[in-house]
Amino acid sequence: MKITLFTQWECKTCIALKEKLKEENLTYKTIEVLEYTEMWEGIRKQQLQLDPKSIMYTPTLLVENKGTGVYIAAGRDFDTVEEALEKVKEYL
């Protein structure tokens, strides 16, 4: 399993989610969306094409497992860090 966390430096929820992932011993790669704007906008555009109501905010996680990947986005898929962690565990 591979977890990628799309984040922003000053995002309090992003910081809290990083801490929670560490507490759970889940390794992850961080991508700062302001450094990788083109990549982030491409992902957001792709998700909007799949679901026009799919607005994605940070933090967003990409969980890849057994050849499939799913995006878990704040405001769309979870409202709290605890909910985000529950969603991640569904794909373990």
PLM regions and their residue ranges:
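Non-catalytic, surface beta->alpha helical segment in thiol-disulfide oxidoreductase systems
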Residues: V63-L92
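Short beta->alpha linker loops
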Residues: W9, L34-E35, R76
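Short alpha-helical
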Residues: K12, E38, D79
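Generic alpha-helical hydrophobic packing signal
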Residues: L26, P59-L61, Y71
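Long, continuous compositionally biased terminal/linker segments
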Residues: Q47-G67, T80
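Local sequence-structure signature of Cys/Sec-based thiol-disulfide redox active-site neighborhoods
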Residues: M1-T30
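Thioredoxin-like thiol-disulfide oxidoreductase module
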Residues: V33-M56, E86-L92
